[in-house]
């Protein structure tokens, strides 16, 4: 089942255990990670970079693949689908595609613009019960 990373990590903190986040690049990696998480009875975060998203034909394809694999492989452990170091535009694509967590990397923007974009994305993500993290930069 796809869940919010925030929900997953709150349970992990309360239970004093860690949750692994593994970036996926193709169907085979995704299958291996999901089956291992199931075998270990461990929640897992599947991370996707923008490059991997392009390689796998877009974020909608990635989301559909992960959801189908969870069903077909009978995965019962919690799974979060996370955009790793995404652009502003990439975050919106993942929101529309059904990801459950996004990471906005606005570190290349001037701080004021980064904060404004982050606030906007936080509002959208929270309204959809999604997890969000952001990178401020230096």
What do these predicted ranges mean?
Residues 88, 96-99, 133-138:
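Active-site-proximal loop/short-helix segments
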Residues 18-24, 44-48, 79-84, 102-104, ...:
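Hydrophobic faces of well-ordered beta-strands that scaffold small-molecule active sites
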Residues 1-12, 28-47:
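N-terminal glycine-rich anion-binding loops that anchor highly charged ligand groups
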Residues 39-95:
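Active-site cofactor/substrate anionic-group-binding motifs, chiefly glycine-
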């Amino acid at each position: 089942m796809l869940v919010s990373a925030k929900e997953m990590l709150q349970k992990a903190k309360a239970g004093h255990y860690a949750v692994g986040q593994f970036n996926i690049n193709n169907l085979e990696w995704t299958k291996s990670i999901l089956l291992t998480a199931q075998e270990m009875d461990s929640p897992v975060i599947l991370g996707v970079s923008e490059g991997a998203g392009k390689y796998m034909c877009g974020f909608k394809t990635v989301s559909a693949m992960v959801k189908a694999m969870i069903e077909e492989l009978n995965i019962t452990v919690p799974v979060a689908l996370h955009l790793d170091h995404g652009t502003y535009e990439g975050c919106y694509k993942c929101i529309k595609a059904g990801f459950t967590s996004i990471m906005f990397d606005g570190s290349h923007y001037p701080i004021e613009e980064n904060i404004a974009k982050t606030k906007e994305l936080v509002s959208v993500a929270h309204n959809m019960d999604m997890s969000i993290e952001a990178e401020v930069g230096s």
